[in-house]
């Protein structure tokens, strides 16, 4: 009797599947048969059609469970394939840059930043670089449209200049050489993709193992406490290093500002000295011309040399030597020299 009841309750387990509706109907008809509440249940269990429906229901249920497991497994595989990144220890190669290409145009915002950054740093040297960038961004957003348009117009003109120069450059031989280099590099890159994929896959496995080893530590254990202490000590050391680097950076920034001020002062001194040298050079040329014209009628005793603008310096040296060597023999000549010098003083 209990086996008949058990066999009559099996079909409803597969009522959700399409292939089990017939078996459910068979069980229901067995329960409502006029011979008794369990009269046809035994018959349905021995019926081959019922057994076939039952096996079909089990097969459909197993296929549905496999499909659900496959759907759950697929996002994990996709997520695992998307995970990754650049392998540790590898450096991204910089893209090829054509040194012969025309200079890229600057936007209006970049032009404004370049113009105002140095002015703001000169006024407020203690402000860090990120704060200066933020302040300039706010200043740009509040800039009147007519002032902002000036930078945008300059950017448009620079863009037109770049397009013209680029069009001319693309017709040169240097551009063709750079294009061939780029194509050769792309071919080499395609050969390295397989090795890069393998390295990425190995890195993913290594990362998973590390994550699993860290997250598998049970909490509230001695191992977990030691791990937490090690992490806290590492964080303290990093904070300490960060503070030291910030202090060094601030000291270097002050040193740079002081050096910049000293350089500016030296540049001002150099300009002043150059102007002073120019004035002295002009005065020296004027004095040479005056001496040449004054002593043009006074040849040196013994040699008879007459001064010119080019030889006035050597003439004056020899004149001085003659006066000191024989002052008694050249008294008349010395008196004439005194008269000429007195006229120069006037």
Curated annotation (Swiss-Prot):
Comp. bias regions, Polar residues: 1-10, 55-65
**Primary subcellular site in the record, as a coarse category:** nucleus
Sample GO molecular function, one term:
identical protein binding
First and last residue of the signal peptide:
none
Biased segments, Basic and acidic residues type: 71-81, 181-210
Entries under PROSITE patterns matching the protein:
HMG_BOX_2 (PS50118)
What is the role of the protein in this entry? Answer: Plays a role in neuronal differentiation as chromatin-associated protein. Acts as inhibitor of HMG20B. Overcomes the repressive effects of the neuronal silencer REST and induces the activation of neuronal-specific genes. Involved in the recruitment of the histone methyltransferase KMT2A/MLL1 and consequent increased methylation of histone H3 lysine 4.
Protein name from the UniProt record: High mobility group protein 20A
Per the UniProt record, the source organism is Mus musculus
